[in-house]
Amino acid sequence: MTAPLTLVLIPARMAATRLPGKPLLDIGGVPMIVHVLRRALAASIGRVAVATDTPEIAEAVIAHGGEVVMTRADHPSGSDRIHEALQTLDPERRIETVINLQGDFPTIRPEQIGAVLAPLADPAVDIATLAAEIHTEEESTNPNVVKVVGSPIRDNLLRALYFTRATAPYGDGPRYHHIGLYAYRRAALERFVSLPPSPLEQREKLEQLRALEAGMRIDVGIVDSVPRGVDTPADLETARRALGF
């Protein structure tokens, strides 16, 4: 039995308000988006491309030997952007699994990118994602940290029941910090982008709730650490230090 073909897509745009021009910010002489691209390539799990509507991002990626697919500028989410990119790159529909990797994860480890595929070994799973255990009260109560509430299936694997910015679940026991990395079965991505925004998605401002409210199954692999995203100048300096610059 051959392994399903996997495509890693990195959606990127220049519209960040807290950190303008984020994908092209310099880390050791290389744009941040290129660091993410290189880590995805190092995972060695399939073809990798950056999906963008911005010529400057495309030029930077191509200059460093990466693949780019240009998309429309009016997409409401990264999921919609990668869906368009998938259709463009694979009209023959050979790709079975699509990974959505955020372009602001320059410190993500290649093995974490590969780990997101593991929950899809169960054919009942529509979407896979990752989380890491929370170890501080500050992280637990921070609304910018998305928590996943899930039912344990086995060691290091949960079935997601809910995602929230609140402190949850209540009581003793571990809480988990959701990592915004997704692996979709192709049919699941196509269904997801066909659905309208759901009530809880709009309330929590978390698009993965659209899938749960539609009855789709999301399983969550537990990893040992959270790759820190870059949203502020302080985050950028942290990423530079982590990468030795």
Curated annotation (Swiss-Prot):
InterPro entries: Cytidylyl_trans, KdsB, Nucleotide-diphossugar_trans. Keywords: Cytoplasm, Lipopolysaccharide biosynthesis, Nucleotidyltransferase, Transferase. It is found in: Cytoplasm. Signal peptide: none annotated. GO terms for biological process: CMP-keto-3-deoxy-D-manno-octulosonic acid biosynthetic process; lipopolysaccharide biosynthetic process. Belongs to the KdsB family. It holds the Pfam family CTP_transf_3. CDD domains: CMP-KDO-Synthetase. The lineage of its organism: Bacteria, Pseudomonadati, Pseudomonadota, Alphaproteobacteria, Hyphomicrobiales. It catalyses: 3-deoxy-alpha-D-manno-oct-2-ulosonate + CTP = CMP-3-deoxy-beta-D-manno-octulosonate + diphosphate. The keyword Iron-sulfur does not apply. GO terms for cellular component: cytosol. The gene is kdsB. It is an enzyme of class 2 (transferase). GO terms for molecular function: 3-deoxy-manno-octulosonate cytidylyltransferase activity. This is 3-deoxy-manno-octulosonate cytidylyltransferase. Activates KDO (a required 8-carbon sugar) for incorporation into bacterial lipopolysaccharide in Gram-negative bacteria. Pathway: Nucleotide-sugar biosynthesis; CMP-3-deoxy-D-manno-octulosonate biosynthesis; CMP-3-deoxy-D-manno-octulosonate from 3-deoxy-D-manno-octulosonate and CTP: step 1/1; Bacterial outer membrane biogenesis; lipopolysaccharide biosynthesis. Its EC number is 2.7.7.38.
